[in-house]
């Protein structure tokens, strides 16, 4: 990651924020998340990257500020959107809201969200009662019925896909 960052890949800072946080360095985690996502959130209000970073790694007050910012953006009739919003909601411990945001913002790049959703960090989201409906609305059920489900996903007795 450091090599990627030194070669100019700015969002490597976001990935480095996870490591800093795991090492207990909250201040560095906040700075790296903010630096690594700022360019990905350029259509959000100024300072959004820092507010969201503080919410992810900071205290309850910082988390509530970040959630309020995201709520304000998503409440707009045509949100100034970024794929970082669903990922941020997942990181803020709001998986149900993250799923909802993905469905509300279908035309944005949510690849970062989906990478995290299918990792161990997406376990809470995959366990939600609304997850099967999310899969249906995303068109995944139709594809999985045709081509087979991914590893760790199976149909339950009700016919819904359940993913570990």
Language model feature labels by segment:
Residues 1-164:
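Alpha-helical protein-protein interaction modules
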């Amino acid at each position: 990651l450091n090599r990627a960052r030194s070669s100019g890949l700015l969002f490597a800072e976001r990935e480095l924020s996870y490591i800093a946080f795991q090492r207990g360095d909250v201040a560095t985690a906040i700075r790296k998340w903010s630096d690594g996502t700022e360019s990905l959130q350029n259509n959000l209000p100024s300072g959004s990257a820092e507010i969201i970073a503080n919410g992810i790694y900071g205290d309850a007050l910082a988390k509530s500020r970040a959630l309020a910012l995201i709520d304000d953006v998503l409440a707009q009739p045509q949100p100034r959107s970024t794929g970082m919003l669903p990922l941020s909601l997942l990181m803020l411990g709001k998986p149900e809201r993250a799923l909802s945001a993905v469905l509300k913002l279908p035309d944005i790049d949510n690849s970062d969200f989906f990478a995290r959703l299918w990792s161990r960090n997406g376990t809470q989201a995959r366990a939600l009662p609304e997850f099967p409906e999310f899969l249906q609305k995303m068109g995944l059920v139709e594809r999985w019925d045709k081509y087979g489900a991914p590893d760790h996903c199976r149909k339950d007795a009700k016919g819904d896909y359940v993913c570990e």
